[in-house]
Amino acid sequence: MKIIFATEPIKYPLTGIGRYSLELVKRLAVAREIEELKLFHGASFIDQIPQVENKSDTKASNHGRLSAFLRRQPLLIEAYRLLHPRRQAWALRDYKDYIYHGPNFYLPHRLERAVTTFHDISIFTCPEYHPKDRVRYMEKSLHESLDSAKLILTVSDFSRSEIIRLFNYPVERIATTKLACSSDYIPRSPAECLPVLQKYQLAWQGYALYIGTMEPRKNIRGLLQAYQLLPMETRMRYPLILSGYRGWEDDVLWQLVERGTREGWIRYLGYVPDEDLPYLYAAARTFVYPSFYEGFGLPILEAMSCGVPVVCSNVTSLPEVVGDAGLVADPNDVDAISAHILQSLQDDSWREIATARGLAQAKQFSWENCTTQTINAYKLL
């Protein structure tokens, strides 16, 4: 079995799709079933898996500004959408006996053995959670990928069911390959977490944590409204810590963040380096993730793996990931989210149960399983 794997998602800042691509390709590189693995980046082959450098938050801000600039160039975006897959196809013209895997939706034109990973299809089901330019670009590109793909991988049973429901694609050619998190995400002692806590001026189990892109789909505005319903004494004792690079703008959200920051119960850390995240999770009192829509929900799995209680939404893929380990609520029910957050902060009996259940639930997910499921799916071609 000979594979060409597209490495474009492996870049700073490393998103959930980037993490999936990195962890999967590392394991494919040593899998005995893979006779040869070639790495494809942009429109050319590369010799090594890209290195994700740790960079300052200034660089993350620059990334956000560059993305904003590109969104204002519709002709440039459309030209790229039309030309890039053709450039890729030309570079791949002599590799017809290879399976090509695009881990981030997109595929070159007219490949005979093409595999794509669809992480979610919120562009089609919830376009209001995305910038209009992204919707226009991805709707066209995803339909082209559907036309080209001989096999679709997806990351949850929920996402698979959505693809089956919305698209006329052979059911037997849609495979679920569930995600996992790094082995760095484990329970840790206060002493182990101390350097990171000191770096960010935080206290052991002295905060609630959100990790993820700061964008409307994540329902951060609802999270802030729910947190604001907690008694001020509780908010000051357990401030809400937000981490993640800025997605597309939401002026109301940032007004709420600034207000909470002035009042002392919110802190926005920006994009936190990968090496700090396991400690930031492990030292948290609770993890909160009331997202409107997820294809998987990797941060929930990371939190459970660290032994941290979870409060999340009861929609899309999140119940599939959290199982019976967390408190779940309708993402539109601010009162219920607030009540669950309060319980996760104060109810020690529930917290003990949630920690044990979360650790057990997290063990069901591993990158080894994801890799095995992926290779088994390749065999369908």
Task: List each language-model region with its residue ranges.
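Carbohydrate transferase catalytic cores enriched for Leloir-type hexosyltransferases
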Residues: M1-L381
